[in-house]
Amino acid sequence: MQTDYKLIRQVIEGLSMMNNKFMNLMLNENVSAAQIMLRVILKDDKIKVKNVRIQRFIQNIYGHSAQLDILAEDGFGRYFNVEVQRSDEGASVRRARFYSSVLDTQFLQANRDYNELPDSYIIFITENDVFKKGLPLYSVERVIKEESSDFSDGSYIVYVNSNCRDNTALGRLMQDLYCTEPAKLHYKEFAERMEFLKCSKEGEEKMTDIIELYAQNVAEQAAKETVHKKSVEVALSLLADGMSIDFAAKHSKLTVEEVRRLAEKRTT
């Protein structure tokens, strides 16, 4: 199936960083963009990202494996995993806990002392306010409950509520995550990359996977429409032969309500 190039351009122009695949392309090997994102979210201007990778697959031969959307490392050897979660289910607190454990097992090599375990940050940027408290950030650390003191094990989980898009540094960052136009982005580190991806031939070529996924979705939708059209024809034929609505629904694979609407249209 040939996809209309104009439609593809519309898809590309409508992409924002809240799209996982596009976010990955925006940050892949883009140290400056990853760095500004982490500095703003963690309120730490001293973070200096050394490298950033996307779609890092970490295999566990004895249990559940994980594919990390964005994984960055800074000059202190700390690891930062950033995930965009569009659904509340994807932002499960136990998923965050699991991802934290994945980083621990991956980056403490055999025969090394436990004190050499690097600090890790799991950052979930959520489309919804999953905790429903209206806060822009939910920072999670272990504490000793009896004396309300930090446990200080170097493990951090942060939920970022992307609904909070005010005029603070974090709010402007969240605005950028939803923005589709390079010229309207607040942070130049994102603007330069988006300009490249959306407005250059080379950048467009890097979005092959997104374009192919779009074409696949179009093809699947067309196939569904073809099947539905055939089902409607079967139902109308059965109704014309005097069959009941229930009978027509059963043999056309349409719902009873759909067939009832078809029957009503026939009589008007």
Where are these regions (language model features)?
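Accessory alpha/beta interaction modules
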Residues: 1-153, 166-168, 221
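Pocket-edge structural micro-motifs
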Residues: 124-127, 161-162, 198
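Short, charged alpha-helical interaction segments and adjacent helix-coil junctions
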Residues: 1-18, 73, 80-85, 171-268
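Low-complexity, glycine/alanine/valine/leucine- and proline-rich hydrophobic stretches
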Residues: 144-153, 158-163, 173, 177-180
